């Protein structure tokens, strides 16, 4: 979405609500994303764009909604833009959520203290944490694409 909105990666991470609003006004969001499934679930994994519906709290944490599978369109539209690495504590106990949307260098930098988000030492490889595998390599910036082989 960076290339569609004109935001640079640093400003998108600082002004993420403005970035999300700008992204929602692109043909990608209006046409392609609207045609996508909200999630795909296997025995061990849930695949989704941003995250599962959760309640964002003022302290930037998220509260789990046990009925997320029955969430309405608005809840899914909101969850699509969540940063899964910040919301990872709101995962089902026996599932790992595989998500994109937010650059993996954020998780490596914030939670592993490994490199910076966008510096020369930024790590755009998949981010693995409790209940989450994040795969967004921020391709427009990093020139990389992350791929996983899942055997489930």
Residue ranges and their predicted role:
Residues 145-147:
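C-terminal regions of proteins
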Residues 43, 149-152:
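Short acidic-glycine loop/turn motifs at beta-strand connectors
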Residues 4-133, 138-143:
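Acidic, His/Gly-enriched loop-helix segments that form or flank divalent-metal centers
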């Amino acid at each position: 979405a960076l290339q569609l909105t004109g935001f640079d990666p640093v400003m998108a991470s600082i002004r993420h609500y403005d970035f999300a609003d700008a992204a929602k006004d692109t043909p990608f969001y209006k046409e392609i994303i609207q045609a996508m499934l909200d999630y795909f679930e296997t025995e061990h994994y849930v695949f989704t764009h941003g995250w599962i519906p959760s309640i964002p709290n003022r302290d930037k944490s998220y509260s789990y909604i046990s009925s997320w599978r029955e969430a309405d369109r608005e809840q899914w539209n909101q969850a699509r833009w969540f940063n899964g690495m910040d919301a990872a504590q709101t995962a089902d106990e026996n599932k790992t959520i595989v998500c994109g949307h937010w650059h993996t260098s954020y998780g490596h930098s914030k939670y592993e203290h490994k490199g910076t988000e966008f510096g020369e030492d930024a790590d755009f490889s998949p981010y693995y944490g409790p209940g989450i595998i994040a795969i967004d390599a921020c391709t427009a910036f990093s020139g990389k694409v992350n791929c996983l082989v899942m055997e489930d």
